[in-house]
From Swiss-Prot:
Protein name, as recorded: Guanine nucleotide exchange factor SopE
Keyword Secreted: yes
Subcellular location: Secreted
SUPFAM superfamilies according to UniProt: SopE-like GEF domain
Keyword 4Fe-4S carried by entry: no
């Protein structure tokens, strides 16, 4: 499966070796400007992190106040909203669009990973359904493989069935869920809540990446999903 680097590398300031006293003034000025630039970067970064921390603290305080004075259903709705807002902010911090606009290779890998994840999800879902009804899945696998190949996904053909090389889980869901779980572990105690947050993570990711498909021949995730569903419907009986 294609691997995608989600977060930028950390900056590291290395110790500068002592230079002769007769160093050219231009070199001194260049070094001073470099140090100042790095210093300013960390000042801005620290300011942004502080603002975000204060924002989350205020939001949590509001949620706690509501929790003490309202019914359990209302508490759950508000708290779920806080967690989802945190996940949305985490997605913005990953900055998929920004990274893709600067790096065509990253954009291509992202598109392939997203469509491969859609393929994997619906392949498993419909294969399980067809098997439960005693229907041979071979024709279905062959046809969705052709759809994946036509969508521009790289892969390999084995036993006359094409399989995308990057087939697997959506690589962006894990960072969102992991970050939210680390901050709000008490909100992930039930399978229902976990499933709800996973669905939300997938939804906002799919919306976020749509612009990456606007200027290429590949279908959007939503279009590819519809293609797979249409294929599956040909093999699923109308009667339960």
């Amino acid at each position: 499966m294609t691997k995608i680097t989600l977060f930028p590398h950390n900056f590291r300031i290395q110790k500068q070796e002592t230079t002769p006293l007769k160093e050219k003034s231009t070199e001194k000025n260049s070094l001073a400007k470099s140090i100042l630039a790095v210093k300013n970067h960390f000042i801005k970064l620290n300011s942004k992190l502080s603002e975000r921390f204060i924002s989350h603290k205020n939001t949590e305080s509001s949620a706690t106040h509501f929790h003490r004075g309202s019914a359990s259903e209302g508490r759950a709705v508000l708290t779920n909203k806080v967690v989802k807002n945190f996940m949305l902010q985490t997605l913005h911090d990953i900055d998929i669009r920004g990274s893709a606009s600067k790096d065509p290779a990253y954009a291509s890998q992202t598109r392939e990973a997203i469509l491969s994840a859609v393929y994997s999800k619906y392949k498993d879902q419909y294969c399980n359904l067809l098997i439960s009804k005693g229907i041979d899945i071979a024709p279905f696998l062959k046809e969705i493989g052709e759809a994946a190949q036509n969508a521009g996904l790289p892969g390999a053909t084995k036993n006359d069935v094409f399989t995308p090389s990057g087939a697997g889980a959506n690589p962006f869901i894990t960072p969102l869920i992991t970050s939210a779980y680390s901050k709000y572990p008490h909100m992930f105690t039930s399978q229902h809540q976990k499933a709800s947050f996973n669905i939300y993570a997938e939804k906002i990711i799919m919306t976020e990446v749509v612009p990456l498909f606007n200027e290429c021949a590949m279908p959007t995730p939503q279009q590819f999903q519809q293609i797979l569903e249409n294929i599956a419907n040909k093999y699923i009986p109308n009667t339960p």
